[in-house]
Amino acid sequence: WDVQGYYGNPTSKLWLKSEGEAALGEGVEDAEVQALWSKAVAPYWDLQVGVRQDLAGETDTHAVVGIQGLAPYLFEIDAALFLSQRGDLTARIEAEVDQRITQKLILQPRVEVSLAAQDNPARKVGAGIDKIEAGLRLRYEIVPEFAPYIGIEQGWKLGDSARYTRLAGDDPSVTSVVIGVRFWF
Protein backbone atom coordinates (compact mmCIF):
# COMPACT_ATOMS: atom_id res chain seq x y z
CA TRP A 1 0.00 0.00 0.00
CA ASP A 2 0.92 3.63 -0.48
CA VAL A 3 -1.43 6.15 1.13
CA GLN A 4 -1.04 9.93 1.43
CA GLY A 5 -3.35 12.61 2.73
CA TYR A 6 -3.10 16.13 4.06
CA TYR A 7 -5.04 18.76 5.94
CA GLY A 8 -4.33 22.45 5.62
CA ASN A 9 -4.10 25.28 3.16
CA PRO A 10 -1.92 25.69 0.04
CA THR A 11 1.05 27.08 2.01
CA SER A 12 0.98 25.03 5.23
CA LYS A 13 -0.18 21.41 5.56
CA LEU A 14 -0.07 18.42 7.87
CA TRP A 15 0.71 15.33 5.76
CA LEU A 16 0.08 11.75 6.85
CA LYS A 17 1.81 9.13 4.71
CA SER A 18 1.94 5.37 5.03
CA GLU A 19 3.42 2.68 2.83
CA GLY A 20 4.11 -0.99 3.15
CA GLU A 21 4.54 -4.32 1.42
CA ALA A 22 3.00 -7.72 2.04
CA ALA A 23 3.02 -10.91 -0.01
CA LEU A 24 -0.13 -13.01 -0.41
CA GLY A 25 -0.31 -15.60 2.34
CA GLU A 26 2.50 -13.97 4.32
CA GLY A 27 2.66 -11.22 6.91
CA VAL A 28 3.66 -7.61 6.40
CA GLU A 29 7.28 -7.42 5.21
CA ASP A 30 7.83 -3.67 5.43
CA ALA A 31 5.62 -0.85 6.71
CA GLU A 32 5.96 2.74 7.86
CA VAL A 33 3.88 5.77 8.76
CA GLN A 34 4.97 9.43 8.58
CA ALA A 35 3.55 12.63 10.07
CA LEU A 36 5.00 15.70 8.35
CA TRP A 37 4.49 19.44 8.53
CA SER A 38 4.77 20.92 5.05
CA LYS A 39 5.51 24.53 4.12
CA ALA A 40 5.42 25.94 0.58
CA VAL A 41 8.90 27.26 -0.28
CA ALA A 42 8.48 27.88 -4.03
CA PRO A 43 5.73 27.48 -6.61
CA TYR A 44 4.86 23.75 -6.72
CA TRP A 45 7.45 22.83 -4.01
CA ASP A 46 6.99 22.09 -0.31
CA LEU A 47 9.60 21.58 2.40
CA GLN A 48 8.55 18.82 4.81
CA VAL A 49 9.77 18.03 8.35
CA GLY A 50 8.44 15.48 10.79
CA VAL A 51 8.71 11.94 12.08
CA ARG A 52 8.59 8.43 10.57
CA GLN A 53 7.79 5.27 12.51
CA ASP A 54 8.68 1.84 11.10
CA LEU A 55 5.94 -0.69 11.86
CA ALA A 56 7.53 -3.99 10.77
CA GLY A 57 10.85 -5.59 11.67
CA GLU A 58 12.97 -3.23 13.76
CA THR A 59 10.48 -0.55 14.77
CA ASP A 60 12.79 2.47 14.53
CA THR A 61 11.71 6.08 14.82
CA HIS A 62 13.24 8.59 12.38
CA ALA A 63 13.45 12.36 12.06
CA VAL A 64 12.46 13.36 8.50
CA VAL A 65 13.44 16.30 6.29
CA GLY A 66 12.23 16.28 2.72
CA ILE A 67 10.97 18.10 -0.31
CA GLN A 68 7.93 17.29 -2.42
CA GLY A 69 6.81 18.93 -5.60
CA LEU A 70 6.28 19.09 -9.31
CA ALA A 71 9.42 19.24 -11.46
CA PRO A 72 9.56 20.39 -15.10
CA TYR A 73 7.66 18.13 -17.53
CA LEU A 74 5.19 17.32 -14.70
CA PHE A 75 7.39 14.83 -12.85
CA GLU A 76 6.10 14.39 -9.29
CA ILE A 77 9.11 14.22 -6.94
CA ASP A 78 9.22 13.14 -3.30
CA ALA A 79 12.69 13.14 -1.70
CA ALA A 80 13.50 12.68 1.99
CA LEU A 81 16.38 12.20 4.43
CA PHE A 82 15.78 10.00 7.49
CA LEU A 83 17.84 9.93 10.70
CA SER A 84 16.91 7.09 13.08
CA GLN A 85 17.23 7.15 16.86
CA ARG A 86 20.20 4.77 16.37
CA GLY A 87 21.98 7.34 14.19
CA ASP A 88 21.35 5.55 10.86
CA LEU A 89 21.12 8.04 7.99
CA THR A 90 19.11 6.99 4.93
CA ALA A 91 17.48 8.76 1.99
CA ARG A 92 14.80 7.99 -0.54
CA ILE A 93 13.76 9.71 -3.76
CA GLU A 94 10.66 8.84 -5.78
CA ALA A 95 9.67 10.17 -9.19
CA GLU A 96 6.60 9.50 -11.30
CA VAL A 97 4.88 11.04 -14.29
CA ASP A 98 1.46 10.57 -15.87
CA GLN A 99 1.41 9.71 -19.57
CA ARG A 100 -2.09 10.02 -21.01
CA ILE A 101 -2.99 7.35 -23.54
CA THR A 102 -6.59 8.59 -23.78
CA GLN A 103 -8.56 11.07 -21.69
CA LYS A 104 -9.34 8.33 -19.16
CA LEU A 105 -6.49 5.81 -19.58
CA ILE A 106 -3.17 6.83 -18.00
CA LEU A 107 0.18 5.04 -17.92
CA GLN A 108 2.34 6.03 -14.96
CA PRO A 109 6.04 5.09 -14.97
CA ARG A 110 7.67 5.45 -11.56
CA VAL A 111 11.07 4.92 -9.99
CA GLU A 112 12.28 4.89 -6.38
CA VAL A 113 15.89 4.88 -5.18
CA SER A 114 16.87 4.22 -1.55
CA LEU A 115 20.31 5.08 -0.15
CA ALA A 116 22.05 4.42 3.16
CA ALA A 117 25.06 6.14 4.74
CA GLN A 118 26.17 3.03 6.65
CA ASP A 119 25.65 -0.73 6.81
CA ASN A 120 22.78 -2.12 8.87
CA PRO A 121 22.93 -5.94 8.49
CA ALA A 122 19.93 -6.46 10.81
CA ARG A 123 17.75 -4.64 8.26
CA LYS A 124 19.60 -6.14 5.26
CA VAL A 125 20.82 -2.65 4.26
CA GLY A 126 24.29 -1.92 2.89
CA ALA A 127 25.95 1.47 2.59
CA GLY A 128 25.44 3.25 -0.74
CA ILE A 129 22.55 2.65 -3.10
CA ASP A 130 20.45 0.14 -1.18
CA LYS A 131 17.52 -0.50 -3.49
CA ILE A 132 16.05 0.57 -6.81
CA GLU A 133 12.41 -0.02 -7.74
CA ALA A 134 10.91 0.72 -11.14
CA GLY A 135 7.38 0.15 -12.27
CA LEU A 136 4.48 0.92 -14.55
CA ARG A 137 0.89 1.46 -13.49
CA LEU A 138 -2.04 1.60 -15.88
CA ARG A 139 -5.09 3.35 -14.46
CA TYR A 140 -8.54 4.09 -15.75
CA GLU A 141 -10.13 7.29 -14.47
CA ILE A 142 -13.82 6.50 -14.18
CA VAL A 143 -14.03 10.05 -12.85
CA PRO A 144 -10.92 12.09 -12.02
CA GLU A 145 -11.47 11.43 -8.29
CA PHE A 146 -11.64 7.62 -8.66
CA ALA A 147 -9.33 5.44 -10.76
CA PRO A 148 -8.56 1.72 -10.35
CA TYR A 149 -5.10 0.64 -11.52
CA ILE A 150 -2.99 -2.41 -12.22
CA GLY A 151 0.75 -2.47 -12.59
CA ILE A 152 4.04 -4.25 -12.33
CA GLU A 153 7.10 -3.33 -10.28
CA GLN A 154 10.63 -4.64 -10.33
CA GLY A 155 12.88 -4.15 -7.32
CA TRP A 156 16.63 -4.73 -7.07
CA LYS A 157 18.77 -4.76 -3.94
CA LEU A 158 22.31 -3.66 -4.77
CA GLY A 159 25.80 -4.04 -3.27
CA ASP A 160 25.97 -5.19 0.33
CA SER A 161 22.17 -4.99 0.56
CA ALA A 162 21.95 -7.72 -2.08
CA ARG A 163 24.56 -9.77 -0.21
CA TYR A 164 22.67 -9.47 3.10
CA THR A 165 19.44 -10.43 1.34
CA ARG A 166 21.03 -13.51 -0.25
CA LEU A 167 22.55 -14.54 3.11
CA ALA A 168 19.04 -14.41 4.61
CA GLY A 169 17.88 -16.80 1.86
CA ASP A 170 15.90 -14.23 -0.10
CA ASP A 171 16.19 -13.10 -3.72
CA PRO A 172 17.63 -9.57 -4.17
CA SER A 173 15.52 -9.11 -7.33
CA VAL A 174 11.74 -9.15 -6.90
CA THR A 175 8.93 -8.68 -9.42
CA SER A 176 5.54 -7.65 -8.03
CA VAL A 177 2.08 -7.14 -9.46
CA VAL A 178 0.25 -4.20 -7.92
CA ILE A 179 -3.49 -3.63 -7.92
CA GLY A 180 -5.23 -0.72 -6.30
CA VAL A 181 -7.45 2.31 -6.43
CA ARG A 182 -6.38 5.92 -6.61
CA PHE A 183 -8.95 8.28 -5.13
CA TRP A 184 -9.17 11.76 -3.73
CA PHE A 185 -11.83 14.07 -2.39
Language-model segments: what does each one mean?
Residues 10-16, 43-47, 73-77, 102-107, ...:
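Repeated loop/turn-to-beta-strand initiation elements of outer-membrane beta-barrel proteins
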Residues 60-120:
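Detector for outer-membrane/organellar transmembrane beta-barrel domains
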Residues 135-141, 171-185:
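Outer-membrane beta-barrel "beta-signal"
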Residues 1, 29-33, 59-63, 87-91, ...:
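Residues that define the transmembrane beta-barrel architecture of outer-membrane proteins
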Residues 1-26, 35-39:
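Outer-membrane beta-barrel initiation region
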Residues 3, 35, 65, 93-95, ...:
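Membrane-embedded beta-strands of outer-membrane beta-barrel proteins
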Residues 7-9, 39, 53, 69, ...:
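Residue-level signature of outer-membrane beta-barrel architecture
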Residues 16-20, 49-53, 79-83, 109-115, ...:
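Transmembrane beta-barrel strands of outer-membrane/channel proteins
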